[in-house]
């Protein structure tokens, strides 16, 4: 087994390999001064692309640093020597692999073939040269420039061929003519030359004509530049007319295409709408058939609950027909409520305030009743405004009414509490029935009725419970027996307020009658 190369040998080899122009840039991204290498492909990479290769795995690309790593083997160095960026670029381009994605590029068939090729060439070079520093493809003498040889290989595959400076140099073209001139000048000294006597004059003419034909394009170009300056050509009016006609034709064609597309879209939309309407008609017919099979009550319930389309068919319309306005009828409940409000307003018409002297009581189209109806609104307002000014002593504002009501309630509660204290002063325990007098009153009434009926031979339920007293008129009914004390006070207060309102209404009616008919 061959010994490992020393660090000096590794640096010498990579210094010479990095001096090649194609190896001065990254193989993947083209970054300058790459310091990493892929032994699997024999190419030089930058640090970013080396990370990408390392993520691919060692089975696809084995990465090492050309400056930091010192444990290179001779097989790895031979792979780098037989490889190179230029050879890899040419091989991938030859096999049609031009992908930029690293995963796609290095998992392709071309990459697999190139890996195998580099491995075979490196093994062959190691077997042949052993531990020699250079191989046959590289010059062992440092005086010879290896860059020139590698640059020729690079220009052959990646760049356009360079021009021959010797062919384009005018001094070079004139140098060979000098010996011919000198030889022609030296011919008289040697004697007359008869070699040209056998030449045909037509050949010389043909030669001159070919030379003139070659120079004619240059002369024409010079004349064109002298006349037109920048080589512009005059455009005739006919060309403008032709261009304008073509533009008009293109515009018409574009408009026609747009109209056709719009028409086609409308037709498709109408067709889809017609199809949807037909489907709705079919569904409605199915629902009608289902409802016809039902009995009378079930059918009415289905129509009322909206379980079919029959009840909605009266207000449905076709999407292809014109829209029709559907007016909603006024419901009967609104009329009834309005009539109740009008009846309430009619009551307020009697409370008309001061008359309007601008109005004529005998104007056309007005009657006595309609006149009062028209004045109902402001008459009610006047009632509300004049209500505090009524002279009747029983009418009070709302605040005073509530205060008086509260006073009555407090008085009644105070009386009840004092009576309860006196009544149950010596009792040890009382119940709610005893406190409110329910139990005592019922027992007392029952005992009194039994005493009254003790001497009678026969009694009835009406006599026992006292139901017929009010019917025969034998007993007297008072508000005290019907309503409690607090309710009696409220009832009296309500009667007083109603009486006051009636007085106001009567006063308003009398004032309006006097104002209207008093002068007649």
Curated annotation (Swiss-Prot):
This protein's record includes keyword Glycosyltransferase: no
GO biological process, alphabetically ordered: protein transport; vesicle-mediated transport
Localization per Swiss-Prot or TrEMBL: Cytoplasm; Golgi apparatus membrane
Domain Arf-GAP intervals: 11-127
UniProt xrefs under CDD domains: ArfGap_ArfGap2
Protein name listed in UniProt: ADP-ribosylation factor GTPase-activating protein 2
Species in which this protein is naturally found: Mus musculus
Region: Required for interaction with coatomer, residue numbers: 97-520
GO cellular component, one term: plasma membrane
Region described as Disordered: 163-200
Ranges of biased composition (kind: Polar residues): 168-200
Entry-linked Gene3D superfamilies: Arf GTPase activating protein
Stretches annotated zinc finger (C4-type): 26-49
Role, per record: GTPase-activating protein (GAP) for ADP ribosylation factor 1 (ARF1). May regulate coatomer-mediated protein transport from the Golgi complex to the endoplasmic reticulum. Hydrolysis of ARF1-bound GTP may lead to dissociation of coatomer from Golgi-derived membranes to allow fusion with target membranes.
Residue(s) carrying Phosphoserine: 140, 145, 200, 236, 239, 311, 333, 339, 363, 431-432, 512
GO terms of molecular function: GTPase activator activity; zinc ion binding
